[in-house]
Amino acid sequence: MSNDPSVPPTSPDSEWKISTRTVSHGRPAPDPGAPVNESITLSSTFHAGGPLDYGRVGNPTWTALESTLADLESTQSALCFPSGVAAISAVLDLVPVGGVVVAPAHPYSGTRGLLNERQSAGRFTVREYQPSPTADISAELQGADLLWIETPSNPLLEISDIAGLSQQAHAAGALVAIDATFITPYIAQPINFGVDLVVHSVTKFLAGHSDGIMGSVATNSDELATRLHTIRTLGGAIVGPFEAFLALRGIRTLGVRMDRSIANAQTIAERLLTLPVVEKVRYPGLSSHPGHDLAMATTGAGAVVCFEVHSADQAEAIAESTRLWTHATSLGGVESLIERRARWPFEHPDVPSNLIRLSVGIEDVDDLWNDLYQAISAHS
């Protein structure tokens, strides 16, 4: 890498730290009179003879976003998709017909739905494993084609050893994919733990403003990138240039948003522990969490907190009684969200009916706590 201070921000030789690269990467070349931000290219086709020909194959605004994501993930390439589920679907399309996917027992409900649907259709077989910091899944991996990792898991916040599981999978000849939505590359780059494919719901923390839906897959494998590009092009699973622009804009503030949200989440989790009505708090930043040491050494605690109260009715009433916390699904935006996760009929039956999931935003932490406390107190 170059130490030349004249290296432009868009150069892969830059040695700037990730909080700087989130701001600087993916911008146009610094020519006199050039725009500071990547333009929104609204064109369905392009002049012949250049790198782009038709809008289903590529777009300059995507290119800037994908280049930025690849840089942040420390990978050779990244591809964007119209949603996180579309990105997951594309990765599952890499599995051969009749193959085997090894997946956690309690993944994100969208992942679970895709796995169940494809297994029911005979596309591939799914073997489940129970995530833990010391999980040995060598038996499940025998003859497998793909290992799926999700850490922290959504919404139970189970922690897995990314490096350890990746080693086990590669020893069995399987590819490794991870849903790194809760982590973000600001905290850790899973590719450095041996993962082959890093998947994000860009909708969440990366874009960070709850105003666009998008997914991504990053990889160091040219072969996998080519196959994913073909899957995207033939399936038409492309993103709009405006959504790509919004994601780029959101990434500029990723560092400051994550720092604030994680600090807020830690405070909220610690204060929840003091309330008699709260039966359990799930947050990797707490020393009582079974995956605490591993999480803090690798992927961090994140900005999602889950807690359980006495009953499902009580949990629902609390979620409906906040004023600052928005009662809505999703996570990762600047605004704080609250919901009883099991209100969704497609959620895993093992998710407790009395579990409340918090996506902690960047508001003042005392305002967040006071609002949550009044909602809990009103139904205690």
Where does each model-flagged region fall?
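Acidic-histidine catalytic/liganding microenvironments
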Residues: 72, 272-276, 322
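A common structural junction motif
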Residues: 235-236, 322-332, 375-380
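Conserved C-terminal alpha-helix-loop-beta "cap" of PLP-dependent enzymes
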Residues: 280-356, 360
